[in-house]
Design a protein with these regions (language model features):
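NTP-dependent small-molecule kinase module
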Residues: 5, 180-243
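Hydrophobic anchor at the beta1->P-loop junction of P-loop NTPases
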Residues: 36
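The conserved Walker
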Residues: 40
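Conserved lysine of the Walker
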Residues: 44
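Hydrophobic positions on the alpha1 helix immediately C-terminal to the Walker A/P-loop
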Residues: 47
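Conserved substrate/cofactor phosphate-moiety recognition/catalytic segment
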Residues: 53-100
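Conserved nucleotide-sensing/catalytic segment adjacent to the nucleotide-binding pocket
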Residues: 80-121, 143-144
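A glycine- and Lys/Arg-enriched "phosphate-lid" helix/loop adjacent to the NTP-binding pocket
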Residues: 132-203
Length: 243
């Protein structure tokens, strides 16, 4: 089953897993949100799809899977028809704040709507915490987001995070070099990403996730799972045990 929250962003369903440890801040009325995080090109989308298929084959129905809304971001274009992602990679300082606000708002909207649909678990490709603690912080530290812009961003974040608290993180950890190779192979429109940017993303992911106190599962994603089906099965078992 698939549900559409926007023209381009699909959310599909699967079924119940046993309950992970819930942070005290989470209320029983909210679903447990499990965020799959990792660098650009680390293989998050592939891992989420593998796990979705795994639980669908078990006939489960109370898990909601949310894709990262990249298609929605690519629908935002300037007067020349150039996407905001393309413009961002050409001129980060000029487009950093507007892209981060777009990423935050679109992801928040998906998670808030999903949280009201009665599912017990939500598995999402990245979360608003990723936007706040990795990309926006990195751009602010570099000076690509101004102090007042960052203050505005954090006010938005602090206002709504209570609606979509994260219950657990699955960190898809791949080296920046492997990520770059995968980014070049998939060749998405607008993804002209230098290695140095991926190294910075890797650093900020590590710092954020190392400091989190919620349950975490770290998966070595340097391995090509298409060539290693045994490793893919092992990851599925790790996730089952983690949950």
């Amino acid at each position: 089953m698939s549900l559409s929250f926007s023209e381009n962003t699909l959310i599909s369903t699967s079924q119940p897993m046993s309950q992970p440890t819930i942070p005290p801040s989470m209320t029983s009325s909210l679903p447990i949100i499990i965020s799959f995080d990792g660098n650009i090109g680390s293989g998050k989308s592939t891992k989420v799809k593998d796990i979705e298929k795994y639980y669908q084959e078990q006939g489960r129905t109370d898990i909601l899977f949310i894709q990262e809304p990249v298609d929605e971001w690519n629908s935002i274009v300037d007067e020349k028809g150039v996407t905001i992602l393309s413009n961002y990679y050409k001129d980060q300082k000029r487009f950093a704040f507007r892209l981060q606000m777009l990423a935050y708002i679109s992801r928040l909207a998906l998670l808030r709507r999903a949280s009201k649909m009665g599912y017990k678990y939500i598995i999402t490709e990245r979360c608003v915490g990723t936007d706040r603690n990795v990309f926006s912080k990195m751009l602010y530290d570099k000076g690509d987001i101004e102090h007042d812009e960052y203050t505005i961003y954090k006010k938005w974040y602090d206002e709504f995070i209570i609606d979509v608290p994260i219950g657990a993180i699955v960190y898809i950890k791949a080296s920046p070099e492997v990520c770059l190779e995968r980014v070049n192979i998939r060749a998405r429109e607008g993804e002209n990403i230098p290695l140095e940017y991926l190294k910075e993303c890797d650093k900020y992911h590590d710092e954020w996730i190392d400091g989190e106190t919620i349950p975490k599962l770290i998966i070595n994603a340097d391995i090509d799972l298409n060539k290693n089906p045994e490793e893919k099965l092992e990851i599925l078992k790790q996730f089952d045990t983690f949950i």
